[in-house]
Design a protein with these regions (language model features):
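Terminal connector regions
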Residues: 92-130
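Short acidic, flexible loop segments centered on an aromatic residue
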Residues: 52-70
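Exposed beta-strand and adjacent loop surfaces of beta-rich binding modules
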Residues: 42, 57-61, 112, 117
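N-terminal signal peptide c-region/cleavage motif recognized by signal peptidases
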Residues: 14-16
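Intrinsically disordered, low-complexity Pro/Gly/Ser/Thr-rich segments with frequent PxxP/GP/PP motifs
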Residues: 72-105
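Sec-dependent signal peptide recognition
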Residues: 1-7
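Low-complexity, acidic Ser/Thr/Pro/Gly-rich terminal tails and inter-domain linkers that flank the onset
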Residues: 18-46, 50
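Hydrophobic beta-strand positions in extracellular immunoglobulin-like domains
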Residues: 45-49, 64, 95, 120
Length: 130
């Protein structure tokens, strides 16, 4: 019974998190992963903005999942990233957590990515919170 209640609670929390997220403002155009120092991985992510205005501050995560929908992990978009309308932005994580070593082993076609934007401040001062 306790497991059932825990599963329901986790499902509700996950649903709330997904509801507070915009998956349309930024898109992953590409990514790469290379071995770094001891048990670390350097991950580079290329993002493209579909926002209607230039972005000044952003709160967002890039999620990586495998072809069977298993979680690989998530990496933050730099909070103070200045991203022009229709522009691109590259995020380099020089020391991604150890579990990102899966990106070194998996085929690119077996990795799914998406960006979840939680909040954004545009250059004109307007805010959107999702």
């Amino acid at each position: 019974m306790l497991r059932f209640l825990l599963a329901i609670t986790l499902g509700a929390v996950a649903g709330e998190a997904a509801a507070g997220c915009n998956k349309e403002l930024l898109n992953v155009e590409g990514w790469s992963a290379k071995s770094a120092a001891e048990f670390r991985v350097k991950v580079s992510i290329d993002l493209r903005s579909t926002a209607p205005k230039p972005i000044r501050i952003i709160e967002a995560l890039v999620y990586f999942r495998d072809a069977l929908d298993g979680e690989i992990g998530s990496l933050p978009v730099e909070r103070d990233a200045h991203i022009p309308v229709g522009g691109s932005y590259t995020r380099v994580m020089k020391s991604a957590p150890a579990h990102f070593d899966r990106l070194l082993k998996l085929r690119k076609q077996d990795v799914q990515t998406h960006v979840c934007v939680f909040a954004v401040l545009y250059e004109d001062g307007t805010k959107e919170i999702f």
